[in-house]
């Protein structure tokens, strides 16, 4: 149907404005369709900088909704799903201790489950699945921990356990696992006093003894000659500082040591 030829200028103005709006809407729609969906998390710049990511935190309940409780995390709100509510329930204003990580959509989420390791810590984790991208490790919480192939010293096998350190991937902003411990451990000099007690995670049976990760940060060695019984790879044990070597690694003893040993 054609427009009348005697349409006045004032009558044509709304039509031009309406057409401009249509062109604008069409342009935005086409731009959105043309752009491929991002494979990165929805909020890596913000959530990866959150001081509670990968840690325990006591957070305040802001509001209760059918999916769960929303907790205050700086300028963000983090969901604690209802399945993690304590038996006595939650109310607005309550404080609850939670662990913060990312869900499958890259959003921060909270849980009361206990992960086997926090950010910066080392633990032996079991490989649940191996895909074309990497391995997924059982971590003690609802979401498995991803270890890319680049962070595997050898290709992980499903069902096997490996020592894994937790770090934040600088691209995705997510908590990620690495089996390349030497990239993350021993990058600073220890400052222990001889005789000081430390926690040692046994990670390797060496010809001279057992190589250990000390307090999740340093390399140490427990020597066969000092041990009355063999140790088990993957076990944690209290050890004692004998000395700090020139290479920054620690010599350890399995028992408290006396003054005579410290002077040798």
Model-predicted regions and their roles:
Residues 2-264:
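Single-stranded RNA-binding regions, centering on S1/OB-family and related RNA-binding modules
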């Amino acid at each position: 149907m054609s427009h009348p030829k005697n349409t006045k200028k004032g009558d044509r103005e709304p039509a031009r404005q309406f057409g401009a709006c249509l062109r604008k809407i069409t342009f935005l729609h086409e731009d959105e369709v043309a752009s491929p969906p991002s494979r990165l998390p929805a909020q890596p710049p913000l959530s990866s900088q959150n001081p509670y990511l990968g840690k325990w935190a006591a957070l305040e309940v802001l509001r209760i909704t059918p999916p769960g409780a929303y907790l205050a995390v700086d300028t963000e709100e983090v969901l604690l799903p209802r399945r993690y509510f304590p038996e006595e329930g939650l109310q607005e204003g309550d404080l609850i201790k939670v662990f913060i990580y990312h869900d499958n959509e890259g959003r921060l989420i909270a849980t009361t489950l206990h992960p086997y390791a926090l950010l910066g810590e080392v633990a032996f984790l079991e490989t649940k699945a191996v895909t074309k991208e990497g391995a997924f490790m059982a971590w003690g919480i609802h979401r498995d921990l991803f270890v890319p192939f680049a962070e595997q010293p050898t290709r992980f096998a499903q069902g096997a356990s490996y020592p894994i350190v937790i770090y934040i991937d600088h691209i995705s902003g997510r908590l990620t696992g690495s089996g390349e411990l030497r990239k993350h451990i021993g990058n600073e000099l220890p400052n222990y006093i001889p005789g000081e007690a430390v926690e040692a995670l046994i990670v390797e049976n060496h010809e001279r003894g057992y190589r250990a990760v000390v307090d999740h940060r340093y390399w140490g060695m427990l020597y066969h000659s000092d041990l009355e019984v063999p140790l088990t790879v993957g076990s944690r044990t209290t050890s004692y500082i004998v000395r700090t070597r020139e290479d920054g690694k620690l010599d350890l003893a399995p028992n408290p040591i006396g003054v005579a040993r410290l002077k040798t």
